């Protein structure tokens, strides 16, 4: 790895010479992202993000490059880091850096580098601060809030509970020693955040409930055209892509255990069953468990599944769904991976003491005391981005169109009082707009209501067509 490390240079990527390759793939991705490109075309002249200085923390992929260039086309200034140490596509990062956007990301970052890079998206070259955050997983939002609390009371960063927190707390202490008011100064300047994923949304709601959230947030994840498409259809294609690239394993006939049957779990289970795996599901929620059972999946506990499964996939957004005890029961050569945002769904920390043998990047054999070996993918982090390239461009177009619309909404309404501190979702008509834009690529033909039909069901002919509480 020959990352650029000159701090006078306002980017840090693996190899800037990869920019040409990245640019070619970005051009292809644009043809597969109709919703996002239509938003770019619609708003470019109006420049609705003029004056916005966006600190972005989201997987630095080819698709994200199209998002970044859309935000810039609409008037924003942008700085970017990846939200995962393994998810960056180095040619995408190089292309964005070569185009003049400060980006700090390369595949295989250390945790120290990760938190250093997350800090750098807030350090504008002119000495100013950002005024918006675009987040995935909530780390950028967490950093400012936790750092501001630590300015007043460093006991909040005194006792790390994980390896991740060890590096985060150390990074905050280092920054406070250099600039004691850095966090509160940046926090005060932020006018809003748009959050991409389930895990980050959970954090936002927790902060809001505790009265800790300091600026308005739009929950992009729960837009229907995000969660029911990215989370479900995206995972349906990218999960097995990651497993196959990493292991070349035959999935047919094997017992695949999917932990969690939300949208991500549903897509993951469909993908594995499509390749003729015997799919078992673990769930805590009786409604989701019933859905899984009605789809023909066997619903079991992880305690039971551990000794039977061949492939394990966590999809919960929760903590220690697969424990050391579970892994100790597993078969020799069982494959263990995660497609939730953070690496603590699997208790990776408990097996770090064992012998790890790297088979290839992000694929490790972990030898247990009894001699058996488990195949751990992406060290428990996102398997579809660590071992493959994530979701296809088309489905990310829906997600990133929502992100762009949410950034416009918060920025345009920053002084109107429409969004006091809290967590919001985009209105239904914007969700439907994204779907309409995406349909163009598929040559779909929508039926139009007649006046009589619209009156009969009590909606406008142009929509929205469903109540906010409708479950798609």
From Swiss-Prot:
Residues the entry annotates as binding substrate: 61, 136, 196, 226, 230
Location, primary (coarse class): cytoplasm
Protein name, as recorded: Adenosylhomocysteinase
UniProt: NAD(+) binding residues: 197-199, 231, 260-265, 283, 318, 339-341, 384
Gene3D superfamilies the UniProt entry points to: Adenosylhomocysteinase-like, NAD(P)-binding Rossmann-like Domain
Xref: InterPro entries: Adenosylhomocyst_ase-like_sf, Adenosylhomocysteinase-like, Ado_hCys_hydrolase_NAD-bd, NAD(P)-bd_dom_sf, S-Ado-L-homoCys_hydrolase_CS
Species this protein is from: Cupriavidus taiwanensis (strain DSM 17343 / BCRC 17206 / CCUG 44338 / CIP 107171 / LMG 19424 / R1)
Cofactor remark: Binds 1 NAD(+) per subunit.
HAMAP family noted in UniProt: AdoHcyase
